[in-house]
Amino acid sequence: MGKLTGKTALITGALQGIGEGIARTFARHGANLILLDISPEIEKLADELCGRGHRCTAVVADVRDPASVAAAIKRAKEKEGRIDILVNNAGVCRLGSFLDMSDDDRDFHIDINIKGVWNVTKAVLPEMIARKDGRIVMMSSVTGDMVADPGETAYALTKAAIVGLTKSLAVEYAQSGIRVNAICPGYVRTPMAESIARQSNPEDPESVLTEMAKAIPMRRLADPLEVGELAAFLASDESSYLTGTQNVIDGGSTLPETVSVGI
């Protein structure tokens, strides 16, 4: 029996990248899945997982819109019955210098990376409180709260905010049986990382990914499935005494003082 057998997990931004990795990992550990994404293509992933014998429901919603989120969750619960686990994974990153970034681009990050998490959590949490049981996994980043790169001010702002939200919710709802923990990935080989590489060097994005890997002590980017395993641990009873934590999964990238000094 898998560590998530009998549990139903709602995963946002589940179509690709880390979200897809979490979905596939949770399915392997026995969870019933509700896959939420803004793209109707999420139906294809749900169909694939169902075809492999997993229980899976796809819902299309825009996390920026509370009404859209509420309607999607209502549809999902009509089929799945309840939500035991929430993974707030949906997020975006657009590069741009602080002075050149438009208010629209700033708000694009805030609306999805902060307000989207707020909206989904607010829609799911009351049911968890009523049952006095729930696990919430927040997708933050090493960027923002620990390190920063030029051109990622808006992204860093929002991911640091998720750490604060994680800790606040963990304290506020600990006695309601709710555990809230954050994952802080370094670079993961995802469409988002590839987009950052294209924005950094449109003519040779692969070289950017290569340089990313060189700066990591383990000399590679993470696989989304590796982040999925950490999320599964935080969503399972194996982490029953963990709440309000930041769980770094970065191959050691935040450890070196510099990449130019040493043996």
Swiss-Prot record:
Q: Does the keyword Oxidoreductase apply?
A: yes
Positions of substrate binding: 141
Q: Keywords in UniProt for this one?
A: Oxidoreductase
Per UniProt, NAD(+) binds at 10-32
Q: What is its EC number?
A: 1.-.-.-
**Pfam families (UniProt xref):** adh_short_C2
Recorded family membership? Belongs to the short-chain dehydrogenases/reductases (SDR) family.
Name of this protein: Oxidoreductase UcpA
Instruction: Specify the species.
Output: Escherichia coli (strain K12)
Species classification: Bacteria, Pseudomonadati, Pseudomonadota, Gammaproteobacteria, Enterobacterales
